[in-house]
Amino acid sequence: MAIIPLAQLNELTISSSSSSFLTKSISSHSLHSSCICASSRISQFRGGFSKRRSDSTRSKSMRLRCSFSPMESARIKVIGVGGGGNNAVNRMISSGLQSVDFYAINTDSQALLQSSAENPLQIGELLTRGLGTGGNPLLGEQAAEESKDAIANALKGSDLVFITAGMGGGTGSGAAPVVAQISKDAGYLTVGVVTYPFSFEGRKRSLQALEAIEKLQKNVDTLIVIPNDRLLDIADEQTPLQDAFLLADDVLRQGVQGISDIITIPGLVNVDFADVKAVMKDSGTAMLGVGVSSSKNRAEEAAEQATLAPLIGSSIQSATGVVYNITGGKDITLQEVNRVSQVVTSLADPSANIIFGAVVDDRYTGEIHVTIIATGFSQSFQKTLLTDPRAAKLLDKMGSSGQQENKGMSLPHQKQSPSTISTKSSSPRRLFF
């Protein structure tokens, strides 16, 4: 429970008046719906007019006590499907992602033994006998159909369901669309966060991934696809293959955590589930941007890196909805939150539905993390980015140069150095997928 002196609270609301967007968000989400004055509690639980009057007088010198947690939080479940999805779930668990129920779904019984999820679920026992699908998406789909009741039971009671998987294999590609259909038919907000395979994994795997993504798109509210090839732009040339796949798992984690933290972690700016649902319900293809900085101008740099990474010049301007999360340590200031918000809102379409959260986490002292989910893109736009890297690079250049021209800004858009992969680097990092 956060305790904020009343005088400090007044200063906070006054000082933020220069930014109507930020003031509106704080007043409508944090202060209006989540703050409970200590004097109100005293009046409620102690009888007698004179007693209440006395207590009210005494409470003037008291601090304002605010609870930033809703009485009943949204129930969030993360479903890792197949080997890639199971690995991503393990990564999320080891990173300390909280207030989320984790499930691991697989046809391979041995793989499930390696899962850290508290809820492992083997599917297609009669069909595959626990031996996997051999990379055949059709078997993955049939296995999920065989275990539909078990999957539906696992999803029961959800508000938000994340389905994470590596596209291109058998179980992930085949079963993930079935899991998504069960979730969406039940009325849960369903978000897919999946990877598209590296080019070196072969054409067959890429084609299977595209087919799976098309099926998945029809059964989710929002779909975030992360092309693994883009990780090559930020990874050191000496990065071991195993570490490259770990990096892919970590990007999946950031996509899930960027959304779930907004809902579940008590923050400076509190956003409820209904806000997130308004932006992500039936919103189609989405893109993920991440910026991290610990420099002197960390707020601006983290925001710029999250928004000016490849394709953001085109992407955020044409997005119908934007969800972004600002995370920092106890040293993060209101002005820094305001500066991040100014960067994002200046680049977004004025008609876009924009919501954001600001979270304090001791683990991020000295750093500011900005995660952006931009929604509302067509499936054809996404397919172009996945299948035509040259077109993607062209859009990147056009977006970057056009952004600087149109906005009158001279923002850096440089190729990442290998050192930026370190989470403790003083220079900003960026990812956008």
UniProtKB/Swiss-Prot annotation:
Chief location bin: plastid
Tissue specificity: In pollen grain, restricted to plastids of vegetative cells. Also present in pollen tubes plastids.
Residues modified to N-acetylserine: S67
GO biological process, one term: plastid fission
Residues of the transit peptide: 1-66
Residues where GTP binds: G83, G84, G85, N86, N87, G170, T171, G172, E201, R205, D249
Subcellular localization, as worded in the UniProt entry: Plastid, Chloroplast stroma; Plastid, Chloroplast thylakoid membrane
PROSITE patterns, per database record: FTSZ_1 (PS01134), FTSZ_2 (PS01135)
Biased composition (Low complexity): 414-433
Disulfide-linked positions: none
GO (cellular component) term, any one: plastid
GO molecular function: GTP binding; GTPase activity; identical protein binding; protein homodimerization activity
Swiss-Prot/TrEMBL keywords: Acetylation, Cell cycle, Chloroplast, GTP-binding, Membrane, Nucleotide-binding, Plastid, Thylakoid, Transit peptide
Effect the entry attributes to changing G366A: In arc10; forms long filaments, heterogeneous chloroplast population, one greatly enlarged with numerous smaller chloroplasts per cell
UniProt region (Disordered), positions on chain: 399-433
Free-text disruption phenotype from the record: Highly heterogeneous chloroplast population with giant chloroplasts and some smaller. Impaired chloroplast division, some green cells with one single big chloroplast. Abnormal thylakoids. Increased plastid volume in young leaf primordia and in the shoot apical meristem (SAM), including the central zone as well as peripheral zone of L1, the outermost layer, the peripheral zone of L2, and the peripheral zone of L3.
Protein task: Exhibits GTPase activity. Component of the plastid division machinery that forms a contractile ring at the division site. Required for plastid division in a dose-dependent manner. Involved in epidermal plastids division in a MINE1-dependent manner. Involved in blue light-induced chloroplast movements. May regulate thylakoid development. In the vegetative shoot apex, at the shoot apical meristem (SAM), where the proplastid-to-chloroplast transition takes place, contributes equally with FTSZ2-1 in the L2 layer to plastid division.
HAMAP family to which the protein is assigned, alphabetical: FtsZ (MF_00909)
Family note: Belongs to the FtsZ family.
Protein name: Cell division protein FtsZ homolog 1, chloroplastic
